[in-house]
Amino acid sequence: MSRISTHVLDTTLGEPAAGVVVQLEYAGPSGHWRVLGAQPTDGDGRCANLLPQDAMLEPTLEPGQYRLRFETESYHATQSVMGLYPIVEITVTVRHGDAHLHVPLLLSPNGYTTYRGS
């Protein structure tokens, strides 16, 4: 089963960022982006699999570029904070044979960090 997951942590509060809406987009060989789906992070700040149900059944991810779009402005508003980045977009390249991609986001009102997780 293939999957793309994320974990959003609020580094200012030192806790998971629950309720951040994450949209997943895909661009294959044509280069045109299409939305695959969107969901909010759970109480632990996680989206266990952003892929649509039919794509989860594949053993590996479709090669190409994937973009995770985090709606951070609405999250910061729930914390009564004005953030600098209303949206955080992270674009990654998936190569042939990758089955799982985990993209954590460490978030604060005035900055963010990401890395390839496991």
What are these regions (language model features)?
Residues 2-91, 95, 102-104:
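Beta-strand-dominated extracellular/periplasmic modules and repeats
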Residues 98-118:
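Compositionally biased low-complexity segments at domain edges in trafficked proteins
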